[in-house]
Amino acid sequence: GCIEIGGDCDGYQEKSYCQCCRNNGFCS
């Protein structure tokens, strides 16, 4: 699933882990 908005991606940048992960490592 996608991490909540504003949540840390824990270093993962792949969309399979975080639907809208930006380059700063946070979901948007």
Curated annotation (Swiss-Prot):
**What is the annotated localization of this protein?**
Secreted
Example GO CC term: the record gives: host cell presynaptic membrane
The main location class comes to secreted
Q: Which GO terms describe its molecular function?
A: calcium channel regulator activity; toxin activity
User: Which family would the database say this protein is a member of?
Assistant: Belongs to the neurotoxin 04 (omega-agtx) family. 03 (type II/III omega-agtx) subfamily.
Does this entry carry the keyword Coiled coil?
no
Its tissue distribution reads: Expressed by the venom gland.
Summarizing the function annotation, the protein's role is: Omega-agatoxin are antagonist of voltage-gated calcium channels. They block insect neuromuscular transmission presynaptically. Potent blocker of N-type calcium channels (Cav2.2/CACNA1B).
Q: Which UniProt keywords apply?
A: Calcium channel impairing toxin, Ion channel impairing toxin, Neurotoxin, Presynaptic neurotoxin, Secreted, Toxin, Voltage-gated calcium channel impairing toxin
What is the name of this protein? Omega-agatoxin-Aa2a
Q: Which InterPro entries match?
A: Omega-agatoxin_II/III_CS (IPR005853), Toxin_34 (IPR013605)
